[in-house]
Curated annotation (Swiss-Prot):
GO terms for biological process: tRNA 5'-leader removal. Gene3D superfamilies: 3.30.230.10. GO terms for molecular function: 3'-tRNA processing endoribonuclease activity; ribonuclease P activity; tRNA binding. Its EC number is 3.1.26.5. GO terms for cellular component: ribonuclease P complex. Belongs to the RnpA family. It is an enzyme of class 3 (hydrolase). InterPro entries: Ribosomal_Su5_D2-typ_SF (IPR020568), Ribsml_uS5_D2-typ_fold_subgr (IPR014721), RNase_P (IPR000100), RNase_P_CS (IPR020539). Consists of a catalytic RNA component (M1 or rnpB) and a protein subunit. Keywords: Endonuclease, Hydrolase, Nuclease, RNA-binding, tRNA processing. HAMAP family: RNase_P (MF_00227). This is Ribonuclease P protein component.
């Protein structure tokens, strides 16, 4: 599963807009900033610091995040958001990444479904 480019935040100006909205939510592994927009669908930006490791490791983290977002796609609200990976995420398995990401997206009310888990 992949996320189309129309579902990604790419421009620095867009990242700055989302950060300046100051709607942030966090858990131990991820920080999420969100911005309400009039888009027909969500857009996501990913940020993985060089402090987390070399390029191969950072790209692995981004691949895992994109794959998890693709699985969550039917449950995501039409907002722009940026996911920032925190230290410790580099050792997580895909299932752990999904669990932690789902938790922080539910906190931010970006992920909505009928479940209460």
């Amino acid at each position: 599963m992949a996320i189309k480019k129309t579902y990604r935040v790419k421009r620095s100006k867009d990242f700055d807009q989302i950060f300046s909205a100051k709607h942030s939510f966090a858990n131990k592994k991820f920080v999420v900033y969100k911005l309400n927009t009039n888009q027909p669908h969500f857009r996501v930006g990913l940020s993985v610091s060089k402090k987390l490791g070399h390029a191969v490791l950072r790209n692995r983290i981004k691949r895992l995040l994109r794959h998890a977002i693709a699985e969550f796609k039917p449950y995501l609200t039409d907002e722009d958001f940026v996911i920032i990976a925190r230290s410790g995420v580099e050792t997580l398995s895909f299932e752990e990444v999904k669990k932690n990401l789902k938790h922080v997206l539910k906190l931010s009310k970006i992920y909505v479904d009928g479940e209460n888990d």
